[in-house]
Regions:
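Zymogen propeptides
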Residues: 1-136, 141-142, 152-153
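Conserved hydrophobic/aromatic beta-strand scaffold that supports enzyme active sites
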Residues: 68-72, 178, 204, 285
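Short, solvent-exposed aromatic-acidic interface loops
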Residues: 86-90, 157-161, 221-226
Length: 290
């Protein structure tokens, strides 16, 4: 095998583990304050979940040509918003479906993350641990999630991964762009990620700042690339997020990766190029759980 061919396979195909973590990992700084299970009554349906620490409601919406799914998530503590790695391993070309990773971590709700494994650079901080501190040199900002549940976008060139952790950041996402900032749409009507099509399956997460200090998130996943649902533009997703009152919203990996999982089921219809309804394997997820 030629050296160039092997190099390409190593980057894009051959799995290579760097670090393994246990499932359901909690940041050491928050472990003592986080309940490991619900201690009260659990009430759930196909579209709702409620216990003494969290309340989740899933609704379905439709534009003229696209179906989307909205998760309204209220938590008693930001500790219940977590991330997980495929096969609980950080490395290259290590993937699994969103639903499989969610099940392995006992997630109540989950979405695909930023697919860190598709890139060789870009900060990777998951549950308070730095896995990668290489600047991705992108025009887009990253999203930082702090231990109190608040969101803040930042440029990697302006800081280091360790400084972020030292300031209270527990998770970062290196995809983008920022959709809503300070309650205002932050993308133009024609903006797109790279050479992607304008209408796409999308995954986005936003935060609503509540006056009582509670943690409130909005997550939206749209179907796309099918005759039944064409998909959303970044601007359309940003407008949707704004309509729910978020102060900050961020675009995560989309296309065939876009998946919403809830109460043991995949809620949306993940698809790749409209060929078949199936989940794409990804490197990481965002989830709600104990």
């Amino acid at each position: 095998m030629g050296a160039n061919v092997y190099s390409l396979l190593k980057v894009f195909v051959i799995p290579s583990a760097v670090s393994t973590v246990s499932a359901n990992t909690t940041s050491p700084s928050t472990a003592s304050s986080t309940a490991s299970t619900s201690t009260g009554k659990v009430t759930k349906t196909d579209t709702t979940y409620k216990d003494d620490n969290m309340e989740i409601e899933i609704t379905t919406g439709k534009t003229s040509d696209t179906t989307y799914y909205v998760a309204d998530i209220k938590l008693s503590s930001a500790d219940y918003l977590k991330t997980a790695l495929a096969q609980n391993t950080y490395g290259t070309n290590i993937t699994d479906t969103t639903s499989s990773i969610a099940q392995q971590n006992n997630a109540i709700f989950a979405i695909n993350g930023d697919y860190y494994g598709a890139n060789q650079s870009g900060y990777v901080i998951k549950n308070g641990q730095v896995y990668r501190d290489t600047d991705r040199n992108s025009d887009y900002e990253d999203l930082a999630v702090y231990s109190d549940g608040s969101f803040k976008t930042f440029k990697e060139s302006d800081t280091t991964a360790q400084k972020l952790v030292d300031s209270g950041v527990v998770n970062t996402f290196a995809f983008g762009p920022t959709l809503v900032e300070n309650g205002k749409v932050a993308v133009s009507e024609n903006e797109e990620v790279g050479q992607a099509m304008a209408d796409n399956p999308r995954t986005a997460i936003g935060v609503i700042e509540e006056s009582d200090g509670s943690v409130h998130y909005i997550v939206i996943v749209s179907d796309g690339r099918t005759s039944e649902s064409s998909g959303l533009t970044l601007y359309e997703m940003a407008e949707l997020m704004k309509s729910y009152g978020v102060t900050t919203a961020y675009n995560l990996d989309g296309g065939g990766s876009s998946t919403m999982y809830f109460n043991g089921q995949v809620i949306n219809k993940p698809t790749t190029n409209g060929n078949k309804i199936s989940e794409r394997a990804v490197s990481d997820i965002v989830y709600i759980g104990y």
